[in-house]
Amino acid sequence: MTNEQHLLTILAEECAEVGQRATKAIRFGLEDPAGAQPGFSSNKKRLLEEINDLLAVVSLLFGEGYVNKDQQKLKHQKIEKYTQLSKKLGQL
């Protein structure tokens, strides 16, 4: 396995973990203790931990040339466009 493959594997794992934590937060709320068990962090805290893990991998990929600031800006604009549409349709 190359270093690139290794980083891409970690990226895929972290993306899946962020998705899982995000859906738990949607289902049970951000402040609910994950799993409703004593001693567990809130869903928000666990989601933020996973997001930071993902960003750490993304920063490593940045060094490999995978991050493009222009593409990020276009994505931000696209998100804003569809956020406004969702508001117009009464979904937000």
Which role does the model predict for each range below?
Residues 1-51, 55-92:
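Flexible "arm" and connector segments at domain edges
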